[in-house]
């Protein structure tokens, strides 16, 4: 079993309103991430909520939610909340961000297929202009639990490049929507 963890707890401070609820193609950003996970052959999808949790949860379908009461302490706390909520039988987790609505089921499937074939500790998409979502084997979750503050698994990737298998994707990184100008470029 592989779990999808959608990080959707952030305050959207640079954007000024809850990004997770912004719509693209008549669907909230957070639902795009859930659909990519579910359609990408992940058996379990967990959305980690924090800021504006009730409104984000109301906009969701097809995912289990977990509340991160420490979301203001940074992304690492949401990642840990997602890992803690994962099924004990889960052998890996694909981590998706709620503000990247152009990540697709095909992207998720590429991570899963690479993991199933080579059993790498970390599998990460490498777009033409930078890194994308990653799959974290359960074997590295204890290392992930050491993270603090507003950081994700990038610190572990930087510290242990030998653990990482990168899957080349011949496209630009799907836009991470942080500011209003990003939203206009996305549409």
Question: Where do the model's predicted regions map?
Answer:
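Nucleotide and nucleotide-moiety/phosphate-recognizing core
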Residues: 1-130, 135, 143, 162-169
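Conserved alpha/beta core of the MobA/IspD/sugar-nucleotide pyrophosphorylase nucleotidyltransferase superfamily
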Residues: 1, 146-187
